[in-house]
UniProtKB/Swiss-Prot annotation:
Basic residues biased stretches: 196-211
Molecular functions per Gene Ontology: RNA binding
UniProt feature, compositional bias: Polar residues: 177-186
Domain of life: Bacteria
Organism name: Tropheryma whipplei (strain Twist)
Classification via CDD domains: SmpB
Short name of any one Pfam family annotated for the protein: SmpB
Biological process annotations from GO: trans-translation
Main location: cytoplasm
Keywords: Cytoplasm, RNA-binding
NCBIfam families (alphabetical): PRK05422.1, smpB
InterPro entries listed in its UniProt record: SmpB, SsrA-bd_prot, SsrA-bd_prot_CS
Protein known as: SsrA-binding protein
Length: 211
């Protein structure tokens, strides 16, 4: 019997290429989360989706604005996430706002259950994306903001916008001044050179006449 050598087997395994990681593809984000809540800890959760849901999600047809998360019987659920029906789904199409189960480790669910017992703490969906071809949802423990806090956020945004405008205005002024200087100074130098040249020529002519 012919036996395979260990060298040939190892050389074959070394030639097998590693799987290239697919870059993350962000599908939707909850823009109002940072405005309405103070965000604390974040968790990455998987989702149980149907085939028609995955097709419509890959076309970036999804809305997180009205979605919310709650805990029930040691399980985390995502409610009111809007995923529209797919065109080619037919009778197998899904309900656009059905309940969807979030996939988390047991120790993560235990931590979330303890934190949710604190008054004023809730779970908020932040971002929906694909990682290595799998649907993921970034969720966060959050505390609701008051009207005073929201006004402070608006003031900070306005202050940053004004500062950026002032910086742009300062950066634009020197360029305009440089352009005006460049356009004016060469003409003056040329005129001075022409005047000097004409004076020198007239002086030479006078010297020749005297001689």
């Amino acid at each position: 019997m012919h036996r395979r050598s260990s060298k040939s087997y190892s050389s074959r395994n070394s030639k097998i290429p590693e799987r290239s990681k697919i870059p993350d593809c962000v599908i939707a984000s909850n823009k109002s989360a940072e405005y309405n809540y103070f965000l604390d800890k974040t968790f990455e959760a998987g989702l149980v989706l149907l085939g028609s849901e995955v097709k419509s999600v890959r076309q970036q047809k999804i809305s997180l604005s009205e979605a919310y998360i709650y805990e029930d019987n040691s399980e985390i659920w995502l409610a009111n996430l809007y995923i529209p029906e797919h065109k080619t789904g037919g009778w197998t199409n899904h309900n656009p706002r059905r309940l969807r189960k979030l996939l988390l480790h047991k120790y993560q669910i235990a931590r979330l259950r303890k934190d949710l017992l604190i008054p004023g703490i809730t779970l908020v969906p932040i971002k929906f994306y694909f990682r290595n071809g799998r649907a993921k949802l970034l969720i966060a423990l959050a505390r609701g903001k008051k009207l005073i806090d929201k006004r402070e956020v608006i003031k900070e945004r306005e202050a940053t916008l004004e500062a950026n405008r002032a910086l742009k205005h300062r950066l634009r002024r020197p360029r305009a001044q440089r352009n005006t200087q460049r356009s004016v100074t060469p003409r003056r130098t040329r005129e001075n050179k022409n005047v000097r040249g004409s004076k020198a020529r007239s002086a030479r002519r006078n010297v020749r006449r005297e001689n």
